[in-house]
From Swiss-Prot:
The keyword Translocase does not apply. This is Tropomyosin. Keywords: Allergen, Coiled coil, Muscle protein, Repeat. Homodimer. PROSITE patterns: TROPOMYOSIN (PS00326). Gene3D superfamilies: 1.20.5.170, 1.20.5.340. The molecule is in a coiled coil structure that is formed by 2 polypeptide chains. The sequence exhibits a prominent seven-residues periodicity. Tropomyosin, in association with the troponin complex, plays a central role in the calcium dependent regulation of muscle contraction. Belongs to the tropomyosin family. The keyword Endoplasmic reticulum does not apply.
Amino acid sequence: MDAIKKKMLAMKMEKENAVDRAEQNEQKLRDTEEQKAKIEEDLNNLQKKCANLENDFDNVNEQLQEAMAKLETSEKRVTEMEQEVSGTTRKITLLEEDLERNEERLQTATERLEEASKAADESERGARVLESRSLADDERIDQLEAQLKEAKYIAEDAERKYDEAARKLAITEVDLERAEARLEAAEAKILELEEELKVVGNNMKSLEISEQEASQREDSYEETIRDLTQRLKDAENRATEAERTVSKLQKEVDRLEDELLAEKEKYKAISDELDQTFAELAGY
């Protein structure tokens, strides 16, 4: 009887242990199911993040392509402006040569004017000797003296205008040098943007290394694109300013050419008057 009781007690204890183990296994099963659900949720979130990262990568890549296209357009504009500046520089060189030639003509005209003045002085002495001549001769001498005075005034005025033209040409050269400096700065900025774009391209290749690193770099890429876009706008603004400067220089060159043409015509008129004066003086 005692053996049966002991056996029943052992069976009861074994039953209780089995129940405890069953409850523990059920709890472990519930914990495992919860962990599985959490892992599945984390996996879904990770897949969504990966999809978002792929979309962000596509957007960043598209912005990069747009920045490269704008950069190429800016390079073309800078090349065109360099060609315009080169042509303007050539015109200014020709203008300087023309000014030098006109300065030589001015010197020649001045020398001839001095000779005419000496001849006028001789005419005055001759007029005093020939005071007995007719009133018509006196009026002719007065007319010649007035023409000589007018010729002197025209020559002095032409000399002042040439000095003014030379001063404006110097100012134009300074503006041209500034425009060239701006173009060089724009070209240097474009080279800098190209290097930064290369760096961005290399960084993008490592975007897929890990989800954490890609998420950390996303903000940096967007900031880099905004910075590149701003710098590209700055380069375009500088290029626009350089275009306005080139246009202004071209207008100044055209105006100087018109002034030179007018001065040439005045000099021709002075030369014709001097020739006529010499011819008239020779007649006395």
